[in-house]
Amino acid sequence: MTSTHDTPLALLGYPQGTGRALRDLGLTAVSVPEGPLLEVLHACTALAFQGALVAANLQAGMLAVTQPDSAAQRAGSADVLAFVAGRAAHATCTLPDALLDALEDSGYPVRGARALLIGQGGDLGAGLALTRLGLGSLTLAAASHPEAEALARGLPASLKAHVTSRSDPALVTLAERADLIVLTAGPLPPGVLQPFHALLDLTGRAGGAASRAGSALVPLTRLPELRLARRLHHATGQRFAPDVLKELAGVLG
């Protein structure tokens, strides 16, 4: 019987040689061509690849050539695939669940928090995962008001929610009603952060703004390895301890 260790893992969009970094986990990983995507995925299925890790530059194109789950659809992208013979590859985006893992790890009390989510498009999908932790209220600031309204349609009916755009002049006033600011994409609008806020920064670029405003920064230091653990589980069915994936997460992004 063939074990999962004998079945190759595809690396889609990663440079040749990246697979060497996975050998210590007992995985055989092979970089495959980037396209045409549908032909590459059919070949992976025919060659009995168990799954694929998808590099960031190809993740948005996965939805058109796979069977995306609800997480991938909300995010507008997929970072990992699982292959099933005779069927389209099953695609998901692991960032939302990994974010919840990281928040639990940080100890930040999300339940009951009044959150302001700032971002655009699928990037806001990861932040919307916070609604599963019992937010007290949510203000959703997307690239435009119609985009925010579209994203809000999937929110729990019981959640007190308000939608706006990130360019709304009233955003600073709306931020004063929040205690948690979540930035999922783009720059932080001027004047939003106050000393009483906690900032959850998914862009990794707003730490300086938090420091200048005197705001607390919710630590997400283990997010990369927590996310990689979920990606590997989806692609291979195997569970790996996040602590052993820290260096590898830096390679695979």
What is each model feature region?
Residues L22-P33, S137-T139, L159-T164:
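Short beta-strand elements in bilobed, periplasmic/extracellular small-molecule ligand-binding domains
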Residues T2-Y108, A206-A209:
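Phosphate/diphosphate ligand-binding glycine-rich loop within oxidoreductases
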Residues L159-L223:
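Rossmann-like adenosine-cofactor binding region
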Residues A150-K160:
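Short, conserved SAM-binding/catalytic segment
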Residues L12-G13, C93-P96, L103-A148:
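Glycine-rich adenosine-cofactor-binding loop
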Residues R132-L138, A157-L159, S215-A216:
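Conserved S-adenosyl-L-methionine
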Residues L11-Q16, V32-G35, V54-L58, I118-G121, ...:
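Structural motif
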Residues G26-T28, L200-G253:
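Adenosine-phosphate binding glycine-rich loop
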